[in-house]
Every structure is written in structure tokens, then in C-alpha cells.
Amino acid sequence: MRDAAVVILAAGAGTRMKSDTPKVLHTLAGRSMLSHALHAVAGLEARHLVVVVGKDRERVAPAALEIGQTLGRDVDIAIQDQQRGTGHAVECGLTALPADFTGTVVVTAGDVPLLDTHTLSDLIAAHDAESAAATLLTTTLADPTGYGRILRTQDGGVIGIVEQADATPSQRAITEVNAAVYAFDAGALRSALSRLQADNAQGELYLTDVIAIARSDGGVVRARHIDDAALVAGVNDRVQLADLAAVLNRRIVEGHQRAGVTIIDPASTWIDVDVTIGRDTVVRPGTQLLGATTIGGRAEIGPDTTLADVTVGDGAAVIRTHGTSAVIGDDSVVGPFTYLRPGTELGAAGKLGAFVETKNATIGTGTKVPHLTYVGDADIGEHSNIGASSVFVNYDGETKSRTTIGSHVRTGSDTMFVAPVTVGDGAYTGAGTVVREDVPPGALAVSAGPQRNIEGWVTRKRPGSAAAEAAAAAGAGAGAAAEDQGPEATGE
């Protein structure tokens, strides 16, 4: 392959998105459109990657540089100060290349999220094989409104491209359209750009006019037709963004299915492009797997589960759970109605049950937190059991502190752990205990006082009530000790 450079056009205003977010930074399948574009071109053996920015450059340029760093590729930024058309944008992009660059220049857009490395590689190979001045991708649309139409000779040769605003009625009837993805000989491109004129309905310098100029100069001009129109579809508004997101999601889902994952209802399952799932895992309806989520084999996920940047081990079950930046060990069970906040790490064969919330907590192998519990800023050892309705009280209004629970600990229901506090290995707590001091290994912690039964209280304080009648029918008396007559005895 000849030396290659890639120019990504990302300077458009994106007004039809009606958004404060730059168009190319809108996301689908867990990546911005610009990220999709850079991932596609990063797979090419291109010497130079250039992103042309204009409006919102203070947000788009740093994003491009960060994505490039993630991909291990240097990205050069070129600035289009004035919006004078696509031809002018490419001119700006060429300023970021060495003046003596003579290879192939690939031009694509930052709002074509499904374009892939394979399609671009084929374009470059076809272009180089014919020593062409210009090679462009085309596709056929049932409704070509808004796209440039491909003009051909009777024998099929490409004459040029006419934009929608400049097309005649007969030209608008053409359904083969320009995909706005090109490969150019650098010399031919520079020469043609220097001769562009803004004598058109938009008053802009059209990159598409380069095709006709290159042909008139005697250069070879070729077109490669793409049957899969979604690969080269652009995004101008949120409707198109949602449409392409659905197409991409369906392809991602099918890829996992073909790799051995059972997805019960593809229509209600959304999976980001960077998610990995092991074989024989079952994904149930209403599930969203987002970000860099990684799921092992033989797991069960869902229904109605959202996991973002979560690692799930082999054989785990995660049911009706919302999790972010968490780790779930092999053969663990989570849910239903469990909330895993960042920093949660559940060991193998553990359990986080119904209405449990965890945050910044490490929970050891075989440990169970079965019901109605908040575990925040905590370390729990192995094979412990946390009773229902327990709370790890980690915040005093100013500082968050940690609680440490040992291994083989059993805590009663409604235990409150007031951090910072440590419960030693093998210790127990009674129901309703408020643990304010460290509990030694093997000890039983009990903070509640003895129970007092004030007999006859209902008959005296709620005479005539249904409760009093039921008590009387059960043989309850009205007498009570004198010391139990005061308001402190009755809670009144």
C-alpha cells in the first residue's frame, strides 16, 4: 500500500441536532460518532490521521486527541475557521500534512458511525490498484433526498457528482448517491482544490467538484458501490442517530449470538460495541450492557438489568440489577432489585439480594447480603452473613469512614455499623444492635436493652378501639403497675 493519510471532517455546525453537544460527540453503542470514525481509520496503515474541526473546536479537538491516545495513534488537528464548504475543509486538513506528501489521501466524515476498517481498506486497495486520481464510495437509496447524485456516462464511467441543491429534476431522480467517502491521489487533490469555485446554490467550495476536475485533467476516476447503505449513512438529526443506533445494535447482538450467546429478545436488548460476553451466557429481555462491561461464560443476565463497566464472572446470575463500575465474582447471585455503585467487588459464590445497595465495598468469597441492606465504604471477609435491614453508617456529615467485617461473621437483622468500626472474625451481633465500638473475634455484640411489656396499656389508652376489643376477647386485663402509668411508660 502507498503511504496514506486520513482526513476526517468534523467541523460542521450540526444545527439540525438542536443540541449543545457537538454533533460528532453524540453517542451510539457506547462511543461518540467521532470515536467510531477514529476507530475505523485507526485500523488502516495510514501514516497521518487528521481531524478537521471548526465550530465547538474547544470540545471536539480534545476529544479527538483523547481518542487517538486511547488507540495509540497520533492525531493532528486542523482548524477550519470559516464554514466555506467541504472542499475548503479538506484544504484545511491538508495543511496538517507534510508539504511533500505524495501518497493516498482518504477523506471521510466524523458523522458516519457504521463505516468500518474493512470497507476503507477495500477502497484504498482498489484506488491504489488503478493508480486512480480519485475513487469514491457510492450507494443506492430509495429516497436519495439531500444526497449528491452520481453522474455517469452511458458505459458506466463516473462523470461527477451533483449536489441536491444544484440538481435538475432528472438528476434528482437518480438513486445512486455519493457516500462522501473518498480516496484521492494527493497531487491530484491539491491541484483540483486550488481550482474550486463557489459558483453554486450554496455559495460553497464543494469537495464533490474535485471528481469532475480530476476527470477533465485526464485522471482515472472510479466508484465503488456499497450495497449496505447503513455502512456509509450519515447523521444529521436525532432521528437518523436513533435509526443507525438500532441498526448497529442489531449487528452487535447478532455478533454475540453467532459467538454462542443466547439473547432471548434482541429487540429489547442493547449492547455497546466494547462489551464482551462469554459462551453459553443467557441474556434476558430488557437488558442493557454498556461501556466496557465484560461477562464470563454460563452467566445469566436479566431480565431488566443495566450494567455499565461491570465485570461479571463465569456462572454468575444478575437479575433486575443496576450496576456501574463493579465486579461480580464467579457463581455469585445478584438481585433482584439490587443497586451496585462504583467500587463494589463481590467475591465468588457471594450473594447480594433484594433491595441491597452497595458502594465502594469489597465483599468476600461466599459472603451473603440477602435483603434490604446498604453496604457503603466497607470490607467484608469470606463466608459472612449480613442480616436483613442492616446499614453501614459511613457518613457523619463531614467524613466518610470504612467498616471492616471479618470472615464467618453473622449479624442480626437491623444491625447498624457506625463507621469507623471493626467486627472480628467469627463474631455475632444481635438483632437491632448499633455497633459503635470494635467487636472482638468470636464475641456477641448486643446493644439493645431488655424488653419491657406494659400490660393493659391498650385497654387503658385506647378504650373502645378494635385493638382493645381484641385484647379483651383474648383475656387481657386492664391492670398495670403504678410505675407504668406515666407518659414515659406509654411513649406519650
UniProtKB/Swiss-Prot annotation:
- Residues noted as binding Mg(2+) in the record, renumbered to the chain: D111, N236
The record's cofactor note says:
Binds 1 Mg(2+) ion per subunit.
Region entry N-acetyltransferase, spans: 260-492
Please give the organism: Mycolicibacterium vanbaalenii (strain DSM 7251 / JCM 13017 / BCRC 16820 / KCTC 9966 / NRRL B-24157 / PYR-1)
Residue numbers spanned by region Pyrophosphorylase: 1-238
Segments forming a coiled coil: none
Known catalytic reactions: alpha-D-glucosamine 1-phosphate + acetyl-CoA = N-acetyl-alpha-D-glucosamine 1-phosphate + CoA + H(+); N-acetyl-alpha-D-glucosamine 1-phosphate + UTP + H(+) = UDP-N-acetyl-alpha-D-glucosamine + diphosphate
Give yes or no: UniProt keyword Cell wall biogenesis/degradation: yes
The protein in question is named: Bifunctional protein GlmU
CDD domains from the UniProt entry: GT2_GlmU_N_bac, LbH_GlmU_C
Which residues participate in UDP-N-acetyl-alpha-D-glucosamine binding?
9-12, 23, 80, 85-86, 148, 163, 178, 236, 341, 359, 374, 385
Q: Which GO terms describe its cellular component?
A: cytoplasm; membrane
What are the boundaries of the region Disordered?
Answer: 469-492
Which GO terms label this protein's molecular function in UniProt? glucosamine-1-phosphate N-acetyltransferase activity; magnesium ion binding; UDP-N-acetylglucosamine diphosphorylase activity
| BP GO terms, sorted | cell morphogenesis; cell wall organization; lipid A biosynthetic process; peptidoglycan biosynthetic process; regulation of cell shape; UDP-N-acetylglucosamine biosynthetic process
